[in-house]
Structures are given as C-alpha cells and as structure tokens.
Amino acid sequence: MSFPGLSLAKSALSSTIHRRPAVREVLTFTEQIARTAALSSAPRAAIEATRTARLDRVLAAARETPFYRDALDDDVVRRRDLSAIAPVTKAQFLARLSDTVRRGVVDEREMLAFVRAPERAGTLLSDNYLVAMTSGTTGQVGIFVNDVESWAETRAVTFARIFRQQLNTMDIARAIARGKTRMVFVVATGGHYMTALLASRVPAIGRMVLDSTTLSVEMPLPVLVARLNAAKPHILHSYPTVLELLANEAKAGRLHIAPDIVTSGSERLSLPAREAIRQAFPATQLVETYAATECVHMASSCAHGALHVNDDACILEPVDDEGRPVPKGAVSARVLVTNLLNLTQPLVRYAITDQIEVLDEPCPCGSALTSVRVHGRTDDTFFLQAHDGSFQAHPPIPLELIFLSVPGLLQYQLVHETQNALRVLFVVEKGALGAQVAALLDAKLSRYLIEHDLYESVRTSLEQVDAIARHADSKKVRQILSRVAPPGGVVRAAPEVRERRRRPRSER
C-alpha cells in the first residue's frame, strides 16, 4: 500500500535539510574531498575534464555579474577563450565591489558593515556567505565573498592536497586509533582573515576526528611557546617567518613539540626557514602552500617538495608586464588567476602581483598537476632593540595586522628606516579624514609597541601620501620593509605583555 502523503512529506523534509547551510557545507565537503583525493593521482586527461566542467560553470556564473557581463559574450563562453577576456586588477575589482557578485547576493554596504565588525568573524553573512578581507601584496585592503558550498569545495581541495600522503587506509586507521588529531593554527585572528576562517569553520564531520585550535600570531613569543607546549599539536600551520622563529625556540630548548606535519602559507618558504624547520623537527613532514585570499587553493607541495598547482580547481596564467604568456622556465611579472570554485563572486583572469615559474621537468612524485616555483612574495622581519640593548625579532604578519580593519585606510607601508625608527606611509580612501586615520594608526602602533615592551625605545612617524611607490622590478608594494641589516648578536623573543604607562607622544 502506498502513502502519497508520506512520500511528499519525506521529499519536503529532505529539501528542507538540504537548504540548511551547515548541511550543504558538510555534504559538499565530504563529496569533494573524496573527488579531489582521487584526482591527485589521476592522469592529465581526467584533471582537464574536471577543469573544463568547472570553467564552464564559473563562466556561466560570471555572466550573471554586472562586472563580467559585457566581457563574456556567447562566443567567448562557448570557446572557453580566456585570452579574449581582459585581465582585471584588484583596484578595478574593488571599485565596483557590488557588481562583482551574482544577482541577489549581497551588496557592498552589507559586506563593508560585516568586515568592520570583527566580533562576527567566523560567522556567515545572511546565513550563507563567508566574507574575508586581505591587503595582499598591493597594500590595498580587499573584500572577498564565498557561499557555503563554494567554501566547502575550497576547503576540500585545500585539505585533500595538503594531506594527500595521509589519505590512505593505513594512515586514516592510525589517526582514528589514537583519537582526535590535534591541529593548531598560529595565524592572524580578531578579524575576517582567510586562514583563521579556514581553521575555525571545520564541518561537523571534521570535528569528529579533528581538534582544531587557533592561536593569535600577535601573542608574545614566550606565551605562544607555552600554549604550543600545552597543546602538543600533531599538525602545526603558520607563516614561514613565524615557523622559523618557532624552530629557533625548539633548537634553544624552549619549545617542546614534535608535530607529524608542519604546513606553511601566505609567505614564500625561504631556504633558511625551510632548513631551520627541518633541523628543529627532523621527523616532521613539511608542506608548503601557495594561496591568496582570492583563491585559497592555488598549490601545495608534494613529498619531493615541489609545489603542484591545483589545476582542477584554478587556472594560473603566468604573464609578462604586457600580459603575454611566459614560457616554461621563465619567471612571470604577474599571474592571472581564475578561481574555478567560487560561484558567488567569480574571479576570471584576476591579476595578482606574484612572480612564478612553471617548471618544465616532470616531478618525481608522478603527479600530472603542474609544478611551479614562487619567486619574491617576501616581506621583512624587523629586528628591534629593547631598552636593555637586546634585539627582538618581529615577523611581518603581526605587523600587518596593525593596519587591517582601520576605517578610511586605503593603502599603507611600514618602513624600518634606521635602527628603532619606524615610518608609516598611508593613503586614505576618498572622503576619509587623514587626521582620523593617522590617530587610529598611531594608537594601534603604540599599543603594539607597549605590548612588546618597546614603546620607550622605538620612534615612530606617520605620513599621509597620495600614492605608495611600487618596487621597480616586482611592481609590488613592499608593505613591511626594512632598510636595517639584521643584528649580528643574540636575538631574543619578544617579552610577555606587561602593563606599562603610556607616555604622551610629546614626551618621547
């Protein structure tokens, strides 16, 4: 006997469940991580087939945005001819922010209000959209948005490729047998920063096997070391400059952890940093990632250390200054990125000022994914002298956090001009008051110096300018730039936060 009413009720219930963002996120993540793992060792034809299907999907989505509508006629879309689409810059994109999202999503006013509320970091805008901000390598703050399903796909590709060596029956069984895997992210917190969002928005199915903790990169090093010693992570992720500091703490006998995997991102992993990490954690697998807030899943390294582009999820076009493709083995002037996963705010041929080199020789790991080498992408570590004469190492990411979430700030550069003399150059948004922006920057910079016991010994100056010069060769804005050579003596960790009376600037 059939019960039509019961069938209709079941169908309605299923539809209701699938409309819930949390459910869609879990289902998409689970499906895509299996798909991505299979493609990691697939022949090139299978990768190209997935890439083509996703390109068709993202071009169709881009046509629904006012920003791309005119550039994507039927012929361009049918031929999948990316070369017929003019590259877009970050400035062009942000100038028409509301036009970059699909119809009926969110507008610029809603996005700006959301990112200016740091307490809402990790939550969803309109119960469906994840919003992140970045300054990237241009010094200009940008806002980017994903829907929950696009974000679940992004997470799945990112994690499946980073942990490609662990996605096998034996390693999965071993991980389950030992209980939850402890993963610690030492990253920028307190705002809508992509890596922190990657750490915090773990799907329910992931929380069954993963205990994820986020620690602020702004913590004084002794506090951070103590927290890591207590957490004893199996997996540790941070920025290369921070990982290098932590490696030195381990070699000095203060950091007592033995992670199975260390992953790095947001900065280029330099040879000195790589060597320091390997010396400090000789049994650890080191994985380098290449990512941007606009496209988190660009590349990750294999067991042989080669960076492999996630060709099934993004298209990277290395080009010269004139926008012409560069051959394999040549270093590009910039990269045109097409994100094949974000259907809410499609990015097609979006220019980032990174320099990459596509490697010609096949990788010993056997992967059919493209191998690349990233050049440049390095801000400086500042070595500041405390009042007792000792030096402190301050990596760039915590310094960059001083400048994010400042209303009215368009672009910035922090320069270590001479020993213990910092100079801030900044550009304000149209209509913003320079004096107000300067006052807020001064307060945030002073707070940082107080927290690191440097307020008495470091001089600062701020200057509003019309534009910030780009590097002559890389064409990038060096946001955190040091003109001071590293000290030859002992460098110690920044001290724990201490309460200090702030003297008026006129007394300094």
Where are these regions (language model features)?
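AMP-binding/adenylate-forming
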Residues: 149-152, 158, 182-241
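Hydrophobic beta-strand positions
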Residues: 318, 337, 384, 469-470
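Adenylate-forming
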Residues: 216-219, 223, 233-274, 287-294
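Residues that mark the start of a beta-strand
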Residues: 180-183, 334, 421
